[in-house]
Amino acid sequence: MVFIKVLRVHQEKREGTYMFKNEFATLCNAGKAKADFLEKNKVGYFVSALMAGLFIAFGGFITFTWGANLTINGAPAMVRGAQSFSFAAALSLIVMAGAELFTGNNLVMAGSSLGGSVSWGETIKLWIVCYIGNLLGSLISAVGFQISGVPSGDVGAYYAKIAETKMHLAPQELIFRGIFCNILVCLAVWCGFKLKSEAAKLIMIFWCIFVFMICGFEHSIANMSVLAVGLMNAGDASVSIGGYIYNVGLVTLGNMIGGAIFVALPYYITAKEPKK
């Protein structure tokens, strides 16, 4: 019996030598499933990406509409805290309802290509399709939100002011805010591969999003809809389509670096068995 226990302890130590090996294998399987989904059902995949744009737009709308109402009613000091609680709804919908989000796929697909379950060509193809779907879903959501009349008057002016601020940040600010944002978003996604309980997944989503919102980091897909609403309520604000492309483009670059290089690559290295 003692000998068996010793063998079990030894085996557990061997299995624990390569941390996150099982979780990374699960991530690679998820990436392969996504690539197969796109290959076998292109329309279905695009619709799923479009839905992700809608879900993220919902998060942006509640975040900045709440911020507008707090500002209008004389409580601007509460804005950042309130917004930090609200945007977690967006990623919660992505994870729990299911949809294809570009920023989360920066982790999943880069990790899968590093792990060898999909090619880099498949990853880039999926990123492009997913990004276009997210963009279209975001723009449709923004137009519908504008037609609803919610972002009118002072609320619309608040969106325009937010858009103006975002469009005039320096390039390095946008890139690094994008990097830090997607490190946190992808950590929330990574935790989803480690955790079994749905409640635990939601808790980690909340904390990761809370950090990125409090710090004021930049999410490319969220900006697609929020900046579009700002453009449609421009007024005297210094906003433009060129500013939209400038912000979203640089934040996208930062998000890709954050997800692929700062999350996927480190966990790939950590989980990889060294050659004997």
Regions found by a protein language model. Name each.
Residues 1-18:
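Short, Lys/Arg-enriched N-terminal segments with co-localized hydrophobic residues
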Residues 16-276:
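Alpha-helical transmembrane segments and their helix-helix packing motifs
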